[in-house]
Amino acid sequence: QRLEQVARQANVTISHETKPVVIEGVSRLIDELIYNLASNAIRYNRPGGTVTLQCGTNDEGHPFLAVADTGIGIAPEEQGKVFERFYRVDKSRSKARGGTGLGLAIVKHAALYHHATLDLSSELGVGTTITVTFPIQQDEPFA
């Protein structure tokens, strides 16, 4: 609900492509992971753009969550840095975009906690997709 309001204000459409999937883990952390991915996708989108939330299982049977946007994209030289705390791709627009620079760092740590992998695919002016792929079965229980 929070995301829908933010998306409306930014004139961004949210769509869902979901299939039933079970992701083992701490639901609060997974919720934060999804929220931070989606809010970044909205924040760095363009008016009239789209954010697509996906979940399902990949070809190997691993559960995944993906957030794709039609936003500004991330330059190749910036892509390795976006999961660092307080890192901002476009520092000149920091005040206009809002946020703390912690969203994707939270995503990274939530993914690591769940033994998940992160994949970022982006093209300037086209958009970005971030996919979080979870293990099929956890080796050890979550604390």
Short names for language-model regions:
Residues 18, 22-25:
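Conserved micro-motifs of the catalytic ATP-binding
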Residues 48-61:
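Short beta-strand/loop element within the Bergerat-fold HATPase_c
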Residues 74-88:
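Short conserved segment of the HATPase_c
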Residues 5, 72-73:
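Glycine-rich G1-box
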Residues 41-42:
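Short helix-loop "hinge" at the ATP-lid/N-box region of the Bergerat-fold HATPase_c
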Residues 115-116:
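Conserved glycine-rich
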Residues 4-16:
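Short conserved segments within the C-terminal catalytic ATPase subdomain
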